[in-house]
Every structure is written in structure tokens, then in C-alpha cells.
Design a protein with these regions (language model features):
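Glycine-rich, small/hydroxylated-residue low-complexity segments
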Residues: 5-378
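Hydrophobic, proline/glycine-rich low-complexity stretches
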Residues: 1-2
């Protein structure tokens, strides 16, 4: 009897805690979604002693989705939700030729753990509309601590229409955030793919990318926050219309003293005008002390390599310098490349040093100089 009472009290307490946390979650969800250009809402649609019925709605300009399900309490909490196939855009899927789109969203917390575990899985589905046929491998979003880490796996896609086709392999994203929120890391892996569309044939090998961002100075009333960022990219082969463009690419770079406004602009990507992004970066370098280090950019093609490295950091009139090196045989079989290299050698922009071609580029407030010769124009 005592154990039963204790268990009942524990379930009741979990329900009370859940109600309080859910209300806070719903408010934060609504506030955050407005900034992102759509509306997210969460509500309880029913309740019992050991459960709560839930609905989470997502509304955008051209779509409406709703996840419904139940949270149950016992030795912790488990919530299971799925897309409502009769609500909003889901009801129209057959009109678009989408078949087999099913998902399950599972959120768990332990009895003595405050870290929620998340798993959202979308099963493989198909799209058949006219002569277009696509097969998607589904996706998985998982996290052992939704506030600090997560993994997204997209299980590839293949499409065909007429004589054209597109195929991508698995894509994996891993994201982690430090407990103090000042450092974040992201890793991505792509298994490669191919496209044969509009007369163009493209094939890519696997590539992987990693980046970090860390707050190095907190925002104050006098100063904006500053960040450091780093990127690493490694890519396999790339073929275009049956011609090997490159066998491998390696890129490593980092930036320091990056102002928050520039971080935000870069995060928005294509949503920000390139002119605005360029102006923000120029101001940060020329007036804010931002630095950019290109540690390595190496392209391998056949037996030849092309590499570049350098730094942008203003020091008086000097802005930065880069060195470019390539093997004489690099790109020798590419139409127009040997002629371009010969012209650069003739005007002194490329010179031979120990069997390799080199160019040293100096950037200053007075302009650009290559191998000591100032360029009239870029």
C-alpha cells in the first residue's frame, strides 16, 4: 500500500512538473518561431492522471502541419507523436503524388534525469507525379541531450524523369553546443552523388566538413560580442561531363575577432545580399581587427597539385598576403589552361621556384601586387 502511494505520488508529481515545463516550452516555441518566419504552437488537448494528450502545430505561408500524440508518466516520461494525416498539408499529399510518408517523434526523460532524449524518424517514401518518380530513404533526427547535441541523417534520394536523373547518398550532420553556450561545433558528411539533367552530367565523391564557432568576448554595454570561427573541408573526386575536374580538395581556414553582426549575416547565407556581407567583412577587417587565416587550400588533379595559403590582417597600410603554388603539369590537359599559365609566366605573375610555379600576392590599402608588381586592376 505504501509503495503504491509513493508510486502514485511520483506519477502525480511528474505530471505537475511536465505541465509547468510544457507551458514554458510552448511560450519559447511561439516566440522563437516568429523570428524564423513561421508559427509554431504547442498545446495540451486532453489529460489524465498519468498522461497528457498533445498537439504541436507548424504553420507557414504555404503549409500547415500538426503532430499529435500522448505523453505518459511512470519511471520517467515518454511522449510519442506523429504527423496528423488529416490535418492541413498532409491531407493534400496524394494530390502531389507523395506516398508512404510516415513519421514518429519520441521524447523521453528519465525519472532522475533532466536531459530529454529525442528521436524523430521519417520512413522511406515515394513521389510519383506524371513522368517524375522519386524515392527518398527517409531521415533520422536523434539527440541524447536536446539542449547540447544532435544528429541528423538523411538516407539519400534518387529521382528520374524522362532521360534525366539525380541521385544523392546519405548525408549526416552532427551538432554540439558547450554547456555554457559559448562554443558550437558542426560536422557534415556526404556520401556523394550524381546528376544528369539539362544536358549536364555531374558526379561527386564523398566529402566531409567541420566548423566551430566560439564566443571570445561577451557583449557589454560598450562592446559587441566577438567570435572565432574555423572551417575544414575535404572532398573526393568531381567529374563534369565525363571530365575529371579534381581528384581531391582540402580546405582549412579560421577567423578571429569576428563581430556578432557578421556572424549573423554569414549564418543567413543566401538571405543576405553579397554586397552587404562584403561591406560588413571589409569593415571588420579594416576597422575591427578581424583576421582571416587560410591555412591550406589544396587541389589535387592527376599527378599535379595547386595550393594556396595566406593571411588577411590589417597592419597599417598592409592588409594581407597569400602564396599560390602549382606543379607545372597541373591542368595541362584542360583546354585553355596551358595558354593562361604561359601568359601569367610571361608577365611575371607566375615564376618558377625549385621546379614549381609560384605567385606571392600582397594586399595593401594601395592595391594588389603579385610577385612585387602592382596590378592596374583585378
Amino acid at each position: 500500500m505504501v509503495l503504491a502511494a509513493v508510486a502514485s505520488g511520483g506519477v502525480w508529481l511528474q505530471g505537475r512538473v511536465f505541465d509547468r515545463q510544457f507551458d514554458e516550452f510552448a511560450r519559447e516555441l511561439a516566440d522563437t518561431s516568429v523570428d524564423m518566419g513561421f508559427l509554431l504552437s504547442a498545446e495540451q488537448t486532453g489529460r489524465g492522471f498519468a498522461y497528457r494528450d498533445l498537439a504541436i502545430k507548424l504553420r507557414g505561408k504555404d503549409f500547415r502541419l500538426c503532430w499529435t500524440g500522448r505523453a505518459e508518466f511512470g519511471l520517467g516520461m515518454t511522449a510519442r507523436l506523429a504527423l496528423d494525416k488529416e490535418y492541413g498539408s498532409m491531407a493534400n499529399l496524394p494530390e502531389y503524388g507523395i506516398e508512404g510518408l510516415d513519421d514518429e517523434l519520441v521524447l523521453k526523460t528519465g525519472l532522475f534525469s533532466s536531459k530529454p532524449e529525442l528521436a524523430w524518424r521519417v520512413k522511406p517514401f515515394r513521389v510519383a507525379a506524371g513522368s517524375l518518380f522519386c524515392s527518398a530513404g527517409g531521415l533520422e533526427l536523434t539527440s541524447g541531450d536536446v539542449e547540447h547535441e544532435g544528429r541528423l541523417v538523411w538516407r539519400g534520394l534518387s529521382c528520374s524523369e524522362g532521360g534525366e536523373s539525380l541521385r544523392t547518398g546519405d548525408v549526416t550532420f552532427d551538432v554540439s553546443v558547450s554547456k555554457d553556450g559559448r562554443r558550437a561545433e558542426m560536422k557534415a558528411m556526404f556520401e556523394g552523388g550524381s546528376a544528369d539533367v539539362e544536358g549536364m552530367n555531374l558526379k561527386t565523391g564523398a566529402f566531409e566538413m567541420a566548423s566551430t564557432i566560439e564566443e571570445t568576448r561577451a557583449e557589454t554595454q560598450e562592446d559587441d560580442a566577438l567570435y572565432s570561427q574555423s572551417w575544414t573541408l575535404k572532398s573526393g573526386e568531381l567529374d563534369y561531363d565525363g571530365v575529371r575536374v579534381l581528384d581531391a580538395l582540402t580546405f582549412r581556414a579560421n577567423m578571429t575577432n569576428v563581430p556578432e553582426r557578421l556572424v549573423d549575416a554569414m549564418a543567413l547565407g543566401g538571405a543576405v545580399s553579397p554586397v552587404i556581407l562584403e561591406m560588413a567583412a571589409e569593415q571588420a577587417i579594416m576597422q575591427g581587427g578581424m583576421t582571416f587565416d587560410l591555412d591550406e587550400c589544396t587541389v589535387t588533379r592527376g599527378e599535379g597539385t595547386l595550393s594556396a595559403a595566406g593571411r588577411v590582417a590589417r597592419d597599417g597600410e598592409r592588409i594581407g598576403a597569400f602564396s599560390v603554388r602549382l606543379d607545372p603539369e597541373f591542368g595541362a590537359d584542360v583546354k585553355g589552361w596551358p595558354e593562361a599559365v604561359a601568359e601569367l609566366k610571361a608577365n611575371g605573375s607566375l615564376r618558377t621556384v625549385e621546379g614549381r610555379l609560384e605567385a606571392h600576392v600582397e594586399l595593401s590599402t594601395d592595391g594588389v601586387a603579385v610577385n612585387g608588381v602592382k596590378l592596374d586592376s583585378l
